[in-house]
Amino acid sequence: MSSVAVPFYQRRHKHFDQSYRNIQTRYVLEEYAARKAASRQAAHYESTGLGKTTCRLCARRARSLAHEAMQESRKRTHEQKSHASDEKRIKFASELSSLEREIHMARHHAREQLDRLAIQRMVEENMALERHVVEEKISRAPEILVRLRSHTVWEKMSVRLCFTVQGFPSPVVQWYKNEELITPASDPAKYSVENKYGVHVLHINRADFDDSATYSAVATNIHGQASTNCAVVVRRFRESEEPHPAGIMPFHLPLSYDVCFTHFDVQFLEKFGVTFATEGETLTLKCSVLVTPELKRLRPRAEWYRDDVLIKDSKWTKLYFGEGQAALSFTHLNKDDEGLYTLRMVTKGGVNECSAFLFVRDADALIAGAPGAPMDVKCHDANRDYVIVTWKPPNTTSQNPVIGYFVDKCEVGLENWVQCNDAPVKICKYPVTGLYEGRSYIFRVRAVNSAGISRPSRVSEPVAALDPVDLERTQTVHVDEGRKIVISKDDLEGDIQIPGPPTNVHASEISKTYVVLSWDPPVPRGREPLTYFIEKSMVGSGSWQRVNAQVAVKSPRYAVFDLAEGKPYVFRVLSANKHGISDPSEITEPIQPQDIVVVPSAPGRVVATRNTKTSVVVQWDKPKHEENLYGYYIDYSVVGSNQWEPANHKPINYNRFVVHGLETGEQYIFRVKAVNAVGFSENSQESEAIKVQAALTCPSYPHGITLLNCDGHSMTLGWKAPKYSGGSPILGYYIDKREANHKNWHEVNSSVISRTIYTVEDLTEDAFYEFKIAAANVVGIGHPSDPSEHFKCKAWTMPEPGPAYDLTVCEVRNTSLVLLWKAPVYEGKSPITGYLVDYKEVDTEDWITANEKPTSHRYFKVTDLHQGHTYVFKVRAVNDAGVGKSSEISEPVFVEASPGTKEIFSGVDEEGNIYLGFECKEATDASHFLWGKSYEEIEDSDKFKIETKGDHSKLYFKHPDKSDLGTYCISVSDTDGVSSSFVLDEEELERLMTLSNEIKNPTIPLKSELAYEVLDKGEVRFWIQAESLSPNSTYRFVINDKEVENGDRHKISCDHSNGIIEMVMDKFTIDNEGTYTVQIQDGKAKNQSSLVLIGDAFKAILAESELQRKEFLRKQGPHFSEFLYWEVTEECEVLLACKIANTKKETVFKWYRNGSGIDVDEAPDLQKGECHLTVPKLSRKDEGVYKATLSDDRGHDVSTLELSGKVYNDIILALSRVSGKTASPLKILCTEEGIRLQCFLKYYNEEMKVTWSHRESKISSGEKMKIGGGEDVAWLQITEPTEKDKGNYTFEIFSDKESFKRTLDLSGQAFDDALTEFQRLKAAAFAEKNRGKVIGGLPDVVTIMDGKTLNLTCTVFGNPDPEVVWFKNDKALELNEHYLVSLEQGKYASLTIKGVTSEDSGKYSIYVKNKYGGETVDVTVSVYRHGEKIPEVNQGQLAKPRLIPPSSST
């Protein structure tokens, strides 16, 4: 037997070979094989019989043998089946018992394993708790016990940096080189890291010159972090091995790929332009560059400069050059990044460069009104525990002035910033003390003004707190054979214990708030580390005060604060080491705290000159006192706005600056202020106002030179004017010609040509000529155009017309444009009948004809163009002979509307003149506004007048009429194609004519037409309000065509300030029906308004007037200011209330209902002005007419409220709303009749609109389901509940605006419990109804005189008839002649006592009971003797029964 235990899940699996896969199949196969064998045997016999002659006996015998063999085979097969079945049964029984044993063993093992796991888990939890307690006790943040030490080593030496740190959990240590993480895996030959028992070591193998850096170690765990750093300086062994300047090699080396000695041709395909950005954004300046030839391993050097300072890859800037692009990316913009950026492509052939200015605006302040962030934070004069931080102040153009700065420091590798100064420092320089030697720090600065604190500046470059003198305290000694020995000066000083005093104590920085003292360490100084103590004394005091008594200074620098302003001080310094303190140094000269650097004076005269369409050049004179200037800030303002904006956000050092981002055509003024460390100068005087326009230059060259006609001796040329006139009007053109294949050009005209068409005379027939044209303005003559095609001087005789010329594109919009041209000079043999316009996209070859039929106009609007595509156009003239020559192809036109495109607008001026107006901000002094009608220049001065002022132009219509309808256009020269058109149709002209007529013939505008209002006394006021009325305006009222005058009946007045004219009629009667008109005149302006008061309108105002008069009279005595109204309180009470006024003590107030007075518990307090009547628990009986009356000697008033009908229903709805909010959840109450669902409310009335629902079906009240309620409850009675009554029940009460639902799920256990309780109560009620009981007849006490006969009779009841037994003193009464008992008709029971004696006194009881129970009634019998006083008995009290429960068998 194998010793290996079989798993439980494998023991349950049964394994069979092929023979046991299916026993039944195996038996079938065996039987089939036997039959097959018998069949073969029989066939064999038959075949044998065919071959031989066999007798019948032999054949019968053979068949008998075969039959026997078959029977034997069947018998054997049956026995095998029976045997197999027995084996199978035995096998299954054995396996079942084995399976039961295995299951039992598995359960046992599982129970043991579960117990083992429970015990193990308990032990682990206890151990974890104890471990957590222990860890909490020993947990602490990292603490550095031994810090890193700086090293100065020679090249090729190894450096071992080590420090000790403790903390729990064990800190994770990371090493940094100049803030970059050191990963030993990246350079395993250079770095290796060790950690043994908290001592961490960084090995730097074979240090070279590049390993000089600041190394930091940062230890971190979950409780905090700590860091230490040091400096490693690697020096070369020989001075001759210092690296040579670039390009000077002492021996031949492979040249670097960055050194370009191959000639390249560099072209800038796309340059970066002036850019505006905001602090905190990311930005990339890009230039597309074409370098020829393009070599993979050799290319030009791309250098980026900011204000002529080379930019290198850093945390803030990323450089890229490749794939035809040079890019400079800014990861996080700050104002430090503002400046003039230049990209220089350095090649052998020279330098190609492009420049543009980057402006960086302040980010949004965290606090409104706070200043911008300072910039350019730098560190100077770093030492062991001291550094001076400087910065540049922000420009505060629109903010309050800066009152000081806060300086923050942070140790490199950490993120916790610490504020260095408690009070804001006034100047842009601050000495930071208290640094830890060997650590590296970064700094930032925040500005403060009266509004708050600015955002922090960009952090400074890291600076290490090291003494630079330590590196100089080594000395080189030259020995024979060229060897050198490096020794430290400490080794030469001998054994010095107490150091000498410092020397050369002086003030290196003096300001109003502090003095920085500097000194030289003592010589000799000794080998022990030195510290210093500083003492000060006010001149004349005679006493010395130690400044740093608590903390010694390690650096030979110290900033002394807390000095009295204006008082001179002297200072001395003492050096100290572990052996003692030196003598004091020599006393300094008296030093007085004061600002050495003063605020600069204001810059001088500021001059602004034109530069481009969006920029202006600003120049100024430098201030008289410009010492220690940081630079200048320039501000600009739109003339008249008085709002100044900063032009630059970082001080510039030169006195000429180009201000960008200005709006074309706007006028600006400029001012400049100087800035240094102390602050800002006063603003300079403002410059003269200047309009932003491009500077005056020579015009650009003409283009599109076309031959328009030729007669064999002369040629007529046409051309297009230059795109840009240079800022001043073009005075004319100069033409040069030359014959083909000639070198020299010849002047055609000596004087300027004012038009763009000219006929060149004295030409040779059949010769070829080319021409070039130059334009001239006041600045000079511009560049000539490119030479034209070669034109042959041969007379034109073709019948078709010549080419159109001067194609001009205007009104370019997103999907359309307008094409203009001039008629051909050569018309052909017949007049021109029209023109065909063709166009195509630049990249296609097929031309498209825009108009199927020739147009007779010399303009055409081309539509259905694609936005963003570029097209070219040409025009062909047509006459009777056919289509003539095509014009020159126009310049490519990009179809897209320019941003800010403006259109012609129509209007009417203050004098009523109709005009068309246009505004063009891009217009310059040289621009002309050219108005046209149907694209023909307007020259008719009789019908039109043109006025142009600055960038606005208007076309006035002198005598507008229908002949002025049409299309008007305008184009502005010397711009980038600014043009527009306007269709003046009949509807628009009519609108303008109407508006013009209103202005020329003015009407007084009215705020409101003539209206009326009825005043409190029944007076009627008629009034009208105009927009405004002058004091000289006149008015009059007309009633039924008769003017009325101001008097007692008609009081007429006018409020000129508000424009109100009114007339008040004291008594308005039936005679006043008619038409009312008011007429107003104010200068030339007139207006009137009428009001018709007849028929129903008059009756309405008359009725209202009478009503107001009655109301006025009513209010003269006590009256109701608010008549009776009702409201529902939170307690579901109805409150009838009214408000009263003008009462006095004698005023009487009463309540009535249906004419009868109502008695109230407390008389109302009329002084409060309110009276209330409470109706609790409202019902139908409270319906009626309620009335309140007020009366005194001045009169009386009545208010009535009919509380019935709709009013009653509204109150019920209001009660439903208040009561519905207090509805409780549905509750179940079981009774003998069934199950009752109840909802309790503050108030319930059966007239409230409520519904009960079962399974979302509304329930109607009936025998099965009864709906009812009481004063504070609504219920649903389910009689004889069954299973069908299960489900959700909903009670909903409706108010006027909302409803309130309560739901109960009567199913499951809730229904079962309720049904059981109902059945119990039903049975109890049935038993109570049918049990045996005494209905009445027996008194509580009976008194009788002895000798009398006592008869106690009562009526009993029970179903079935009860058993009746009498007792005396709780014992069964023995019946005899003295005691007689009878029961008649099963319900009348009596006890007769004959001859009563005193012994018969006692308690008698009657016991009545059937199967449902019964009761016992006690009667006390008192017998007295003759002559005794009769005992007092309370008469009329019946005996109280005692219940008897039913027998347990019932």
Curated annotation (Swiss-Prot):
> PROSITE patterns per the record?
FN3 (PS50853), IG_LIKE (PS50835)
> Domain Ig-like C2-type: where?
142-233, 254-359, 899-995, 1002-1115, 1118-1204, 1225-1322, 1333-1422
Pinpoint the Fibronectin type-III domain residues: 373-468, 501-596, 602-695, 698-800, 803-900
**A GO CC term assigned to this protein in UniProt:** M band
A Pfam match is fn3
Recorded hits in CDD domains, A to Z, give: FN3, Ig, IgI_M-protein_C, IgI_titin_I1-like
Region of interest: Disordered: 66-87
Q: Which GO terms describe its biological process?
A: sarcomere organization
What is the recorded name of this protein? M-protein, striated muscle
Species this chain originates from:
Gallus gallus
